[in-house]
Amino acid sequence: MEGHSNTSVILHTYQQQQPQQLISSIIPQTLSDGYGISAPISQADCSGNSNFVNTNPWNNTTFQAYQTDAQFTNEISVLNYPNVYDDFSKESSNGILSDPSLHGSNSSSSTSDVGSSVDCSISPEPILMPSVKRGRPTENPCWAYFHRIDDQLVKCRLCTKVVRSACATNMTKHLERHHADDYQKVTGQLKLFRMNDVGIRSKMHYEVADNPLSTLPVVTNSYILPKMEPMDTFDPSQYYGMQQDPTLNQQQFIQFEQPQASIDPQTWPLTHFWQNTAQTNIMSHLGEASTSTLGSSVIQEAHKMNPDSNDKSFQLDLEQQNCVIIEQKLDDKPRVTKPTTKPYQKRNRKTEHPVWAFFKRTGDGNAECIICQGVVKSPCSSNFMRHLMRHHSTEYNDVYLKWIEKRNITHPGIHCTSVPPPAFINNETSRTEQTTFSVK
């Protein structure tokens, strides 16, 4: 028999599932047709047709006597060979992709010739790609100083230190801490790269002329004062709806009507304002000497605009008045000198609470009890009174009475204390003390 029959192809494909000794007993040589006449199975020549299984699949008519067998039904008889392996994601320890048939993959067929019975599970050659995290190139120049170990680690080429969480920020910080000169180079290169990148992108979207500088004439001081043409006459009725008052002094508008020709038209409103109001309104408002820089600057500008006045005498009078006022203000303010020997004191006033008679300050900012040498932190009268109330009841009662008596003298009718009154043992004593020092 030339070539390979379809039975041999099926048996070779399922050679791992079916033992070899059962082939002759399972496959018969003759089959009975519908009329009860047995006829031999025709042996087709498959040597010249490699797609025999796909073009002439076996069906239920061919294997009517063996439909009860689970291994030779029509479902498993039709061979569908996939073109791509589905288990190529596994890698071996040496970094080479392994064959999926070695891992027990379900895709045991291959893309080789089905008609050949030599091998039906030949895997293609694996292609190893470099470990690239992103498709775009790295634009930061700091990558030139580092060698990538994996997706999370890089090694510095200068000091061979490993930097985790490989990104441009961490690598730039490493250069900044350990390689200052190279860090300056990297920052300069990065700025230059970004400037060039921005220039290229702007040229792509906008047309930039070769000479971008404007040749329009620039008027000096045009942005300081608006351009105003000199007015020939000033008529208030043009701007305000008012009636003419016969009692109004018309001499106030003479200088508005005839401005000086020597004055620059651009600065004419400002100079006109100074000439009319500098000596009348501002000097009357600044009759008293001013110690602020604003007042002195206004006075200087007023004298500059009116040089005909007696500048020297007026300026001397202002300076003398300023000196007198400054001396008076300094004398009125009490001069406070910070103590240098006791830096822990927060206030310069004397402690008025009588509880301080039982405590003294320590060098660390706390206080020490004179009776029991106990240290009280955060020294204040409330903490001292609580210490006496817990540990020295007799002294606490005395201090409390002294404090109430002193408060009655300085602040009559007002008793502000965060410490409770003493608990007297004798009821009669408590009554007498309560009648003597009644708290309203």
From Swiss-Prot:
Pfam families with a match to the protein in the record: zf-BED (PF02892)
Disulphide-bridged cysteine pairs: none
Binding-site residues for Zn(2+) 1, renumbered to this chain: C156, C159, H174, H179
GO process terms (BP): regulation of transcription by RNA polymerase II
Biased composition annotated in UniProt, kind: Low complexity: 98-119
Record keywords: Metal-binding, Repeat, Zinc, Zinc-finger
InterPro entries: Cuticle_assoc_protein (IPR053031), Znf_BED (IPR003656), Znf_C2H2_sf (IPR036236)
Keyword match Zinc-finger: yes
Amino acids binding Zn(2+) 2: C369, C372, H387, H392
ZnF (BED-type) residues: 137-186, 350-399
Region (Disordered): 96-119
Example of a GO cellular component annotation carried by this entry: nucleus
GO MF, one example: sequence-specific double-stranded DNA binding
SMART domains reported for this sequence: ZnF_BED (SM00614)
Record bears the keyword Zinc: yes
Cited function: May be directly or indirectly involved in cuticle function.
Record's protein name: Protein dumpy-20
Species assigned in the record: Caenorhabditis elegans
